[in-house]
């Protein structure tokens, strides 16, 4: 009997220097998608290293990191904001006018204030961000590993 083809699972990288927030969001995502892969990084450099080491479907990025600005990491992840090769959802602790728009102008699909974001909100944003990037031409989406 032929074996079923293996369906690739969703891989999400969660980069957040706040241990409590990172664990909370990661736990929710793991519960919602038990077959998915949720990787965690506590700072920008380790997050970028993980991102470069394997194929990811989405990166959830906190703007407040211990080693650098989340915007620096965002620009590294999405060098051409109009042609994102990876879905990125940004989280922040700041309620600041214009911050969300700046994140979007730099390639993030969405930006949420952590205190007002549920795990369900984040999950929906991840799915929408992946769908959005999936609509891009393939040559704009895929990067060599």
Where are these regions (language model features)?
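Acidic, metal-coordinating helix/loop segments flanking the phosphotransfer/catalytic sites
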Residues: 40-58
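Conserved phosphotransfer microenvironments
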Residues: 60-77, 96
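Short amphipathic alpha-helix used as the core "switch/output" element in two-component signaling
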Residues: 49, 71-84
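Active-site residues of response regulator receiver
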Residues: 16, 62-64, 92
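A short, hydrophobic beta-strand element within the central beta-sheet of small alpha/beta folds
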Residues: 85-97
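CheY-like receiver
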Residues: 131-145
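Alpha4 helix (beta4-alpha4-beta5 surface) of REC/receiver domains from two-component response regulators
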Residues: 72, 94-112, 116-124
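Conserved acidic segment of CheY-like receiver
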Residues: 6-20, 25-29, 59
